[in-house]
A protein has these predicted regions:
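Short, cationic-aromatic polyanion-contact patches
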Residues: 255-266
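A short, conserved structural fragment
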Residues: 245-255
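Short amphipathic alpha-helical interaction segments
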Residues: 230-246
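A structured, charge-rich N-terminal accessory region that forms the first stable segment of a protein
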Residues: 1-67
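Short acidic, hydrophobic short linear motifs in intrinsically disordered regions
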Residues: 211-226, 233
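A conserved mid-domain beta-alpha-beta active-site/ligand-binding segment of alpha/beta enzyme cores
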Residues: 131-214
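A short alpha->loop->secondary-structure connector
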Residues: 25-26, 102-115
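Long, hydrophobic/aromatic-enriched structural stretches that serve as scaffold segments
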Residues: 58-102
C-alpha cells in the first residue's frame, strides 16, 4: 500500500524518516514547515502574503517565506489529488493539532484516504536507546512529534488508523473556525483550540527579566519552558523580546537585530 506520512516540522520529519528506515520501510515523509499556532491564518489556504509578512517580522529576515508557503499550498493540492493513503502524525500541542485539522480540511472530500498516528505524553516514557528523557518532564504534558526519538516512533507505527468521516468533518470545521478567528495565537486546552494574545507571554518574559542585565537567551529559554498551552519556539520568544524592547518595556544592551547575543533588563 502506498503511504505518505505527514508531520509538522523538519525535526519531526527526520525522526520519522529514520523510524521508517529502522522498520525496513521506504514510505514518503512530508514535513509541513509552518507553526500554525502563531500569527495570522485567515487566508493561509488562499494566499501566503500575510503569513510570509509575519514570519519575516519574527525572523527579522529577508528570506523568501512567500515561496516556501506557496510550495506548502501546492503540496496540499497534490495530497488531495493523489491516491495514496495519508497518515498524519500529531502530538498534543496546538501546532500539531492545527496541522491535523488543516490536512483534514484539504482531504475532507476523500476521507477514506486519511489516517492518523497519535502521540501522547506517556509515549515519551517508552524505553528507547535514543529517547529524550528531559521531554517527559514537561509540567504541561504537551507533546510534538519532534520530541520523540526514532525508536519511540517505530513503536507507534502499528497505531496508525483511519479517521472516521464524522471526525474528519469536525476537524475540517474546526480548522475553518480557527482561520476565521484569526487570533494572534492559538492554544490547545482540553483538546480544544482557543484564541489567545501575546499578553501572557510578554508578562512572563517581563517577570523573568530583572533590573540587572541578563542574556536574552536566558530570558527566552526560561519562557520556552513555561505553560502557555502552545509550544513557544525560540524564534517567537526572541521576537517577543524585540517587541518588548521596541515598546520600551525592556532595555537592551546590544542591538534588536542581534537579539540572540544581546542582554536585557527591565
Amino acid at each position: 500500500m502506498n503511504l505518505i506520512h505527514v508531520t509538522n516540522g523538519d525535526s519531526a520529519a527526520r525522526s520519522l524518516t529514520e523510524a521508517l528506515l529502522l522498520a525496513g520501510r521506504d514510505d514518503q515523509v512530508i514535513a509541513l514547515r509552518d507553526d500554525l499556532a502563531v500569527g495570522p491564518i485567515r487566508d493561509v489556504d488562499e494566499s501566503p502574503v500575510a503569513r510570509a509578512t509575519f514570519w519575516r517580522h519574527v525572523w527579522n529576515s529577508a528570506v523568501d517565506f512567500e515561496a516556501e508557503l506557496k510550495a506548502q499550498q501546492a503540496l496540499f493540492g497534490r495530497l488531495a489529488r493523489g491516491d495514496a493513503q495519508v497518515v498524519v502524525w500529531h502530538g498534543q500541542s496546538a501546532a500539531d493539532q492545527l496541522t491535523l485539522r488543516r490536512v483534514a480540511y484539504h482531504l475532507r472530500n476523500v476521507p477514506q484516504r486519511l489516517n492518523e498516528a497519535k502521540l501522547a505524553f506517556d509515549d515519551l516514557s517508552v524505553a528507547a536507546p535514543d529517547a529524550h528523557p528531559e521531554e517527559a518532564s514537561r509540567p504541561d504534558r504537551a507533546t510534538a512529534v519532534g520530541m520523540f526519538s526514532p525508536h519511540q516512533l517505530v513503536a507507534k507505527l502499528p497505531s496508525a488508523a483511519p479517521i472516521s468521516v464524522l471526525r474528519i468533518s469536525r476537524l475540517a470545521l474546526e480548522w475553518q473556525e480557527a482561520k476565521h478567528s484569526n487570533a494572534e495565537n492559538r492554544r490547545l486546552r482540553d483538546n480544544m483550540l482557543v484564541s489567545g494574545t501575546w499578553t501572557d507571554v510578554d508578562e512572563a518574559m517581563l517577570d523573568i527579566a530583572t533590573s540587572e542585565w541578563c542574556p536574552a537567551r536566558r530570558i527566552a529559554g526560561e519562557a520556552m519552558t513555561q505553560q502557555f498551552d502552545f509550544l513557544l519556539s525560540d524564534s517567537v520568544a526572541f521576537w517577543r523580546c524585540r517587541e518588548l524592547v521596541a515598546a520600551g518595556r525592556l532595555k537592551i544592551r546590544g542591538t534588536p537585530s542581534e537579539i540572540v547575543d544581546a542582554e536585557l533588563r527591565r
